[in-house]
Amino acid sequence: MDLSDLVQLYSDGIPQPTITPPTQNKDELNKNNNNKNKIIRHKGGNKNNRNNKNNVDNNNNNNNNNNNNEKQNQTNVNNEKITNTETLEIKKNNNNNNNNNNNNNNNNNNNNNNKNKYNKFNDNNNKKNKRNNDDDDDKEEMKRIKLFNQRLKEIKIQESPEDIARYLEERRRRYPSKANIEAKKKEEEDARKRGELLYNNNNNSKKKQTPDKKKKLENQTSKNNNKSSTTKTELTNTTTNTSSTTNPTTDTTTTTTNVVSIQKENENQEKENNDNDNDNEPIEVPSTLEFNKFEEKPIKEVKVNTASSNKRNKKRNNPKKVKEEPQVNKFQDSLFTKLFERDISAENNIILQCFRHFANKINQINGNDKLDEKKEI
């Protein structure tokens, strides 16, 4: 129903006030009434038609409303079903999500456990591999030893009986029996007489060349200087003793004779050590008159400077300490000397034998000359 239809219904249905018409004739009244009734009928028909139309419209509207309500109900039912299904789906989805999360967590845990197991397995495998490598190395060494032993056996099998007999003879020769030891000693003595240097096989017994020889030489020179200084002091003491007892003329003669006699004694000792053949020869001592011909050399007296400066004394008494540098063996055996040690020793022995031969020849010649001189005398 529209609003216009409702307004017409309300306007038609309102009772109008009855107006008393003026008094007229009956015929006129009847005519008027008939006309009014016609109008009313016509209006009533129109109203009924309108009402019927309105009712039809209302029925249609109601039907439409019912249809709409049914549709709405169906939609509501459908919506309820949908909501129920949605809730169910949501619940299902939530459950599925929870299950998926749980499954993922379980999978992660399983993966972590598998990783840990894999790491442990790898560690164990690494340890086993190390052991296996060690075992493999040991096995390889054992194989090498076995191969080496097999080769030795093959070599021994391939050896002929002549080689074995030769080997046994060499062993018998080198065996340290009494006869072999005595023969070796004789060979060493002959080599020493020849002038050969004997080198033992023991490398520890061999003295290495070191720069300590310089120190030994310095010590020897210092000792010789000390000896010479002591001899000089003895000579001066003898001269002072003789001068105190005798005259100045006799002092010079005695000092010169003492000095000459000491020098001659030293020379004679050296000659005795060098030449054993000339021990019985007479020693000629010069007379004192020959030495008196030489001019006398005055002995200089050394004066001690007592007024020397303190600085010099301090420097002499307190010399600066020289830093001792680490000693380095300059004479180290090279690889060449180590490799060719036997050849070098053999060459040295030959060179020494040559020098020995020359020295013996020279001594023989000198001895023959001296014998000839004695025969002539």
UniProtKB/Swiss-Prot annotation:
Alphabetized GO MF terms: RNA binding
One record GO biological process: box C/D snoRNP assembly
Domain of life of the source: Eukaryota
Residue spans of biased composition, Low complexity class: 14-24, 46-79, 93-124, 221-257
Ranges of compositional bias, category Basic and acidic residues: 182-196, 209-218, 265-274, 292-303
UniProt biased composition (Basic residues): 311-320
Stretches the record annotates as Disordered: 10-79, 91-141, 182-257, 265-284, 289-326
Pfam family, one: NUFIP1
InterPro entries: NUFIP1-like, NUFIP1_cons_dom
GO cellular component assignments: nucleus
PANTHER family xrefs: FMR1-INTERACTING PROTEIN NUFIP1, NUCLEAR FRAGILE X MENTAL RETARDATION PROTEIN INTERACTING PROTEIN 1
Designated name of the protein: Putative uncharacterized protein DDB_G0274405
Source organism: Dictyostelium discoideum
